[in-house]
Swiss-Prot record:
The presence of a 'disulfide through disulfide knot' structurally defines this protein as a knottin. Belongs to the neurotoxin 25 family. F7 subfamily. Its main location: secreted. Expressed by the venom gland. The lineage of its organism: Eukaryota, Metazoa, Ecdysozoa, Arthropoda, Chelicerata. This is Hainantoxin-XVIII-5.
Length: 109
């Protein structure tokens, strides 16, 4: 008898702790929404640079799989238009697919 009361009481405590009220969730979401900021990283513009040219944004590079990537030359960071991601043909194909997806979400005109 005492064991069944302990089991029921424990179950009720777990249920109360595990399922917070809807009101507290709404308050937490409201606070989160107040702190959120929208950051626009890409600006819509037509492409003007070919593979190998220096760039600042993906939209500047012409080509469906061409992105503005970072390479290091003599210890300095250089951004340039590129589409090759690897010397391995399989990895390069996957990289071009990722570049295509990245360009799709860049919203370039």
């Amino acid at each position: 008898m005492k064991l069944s009361i302990i089991i029921i009481a424990t179950s009720l405590v777990i249920a109360v702790v595990a399922f917070p009220s809807k009101d507290s969730k709404a308050i937490e979401n409201d606070k989160t929404e107040q702190r959120m900021e929208i950051v626009v990283q890409e600006t819509a513009r037509a492409c003007s640079k070919q593979i190998g040219n220096k760039c600042k944004r993906n939209c500047e590079c012409c080509g469906k799989t061409v992105v503005c990537g970072t390479i290091y030359v003599g210890g300095k960071e250089v951004n340039q238009c590129m589409d090759k991601t690897s010397d391995n043909a399989i990895l390069n194909g996957l990289g071009k697919g990722m570049n295509f997806i990245e360009n799709t979400f860049s919203f370039c005109v």
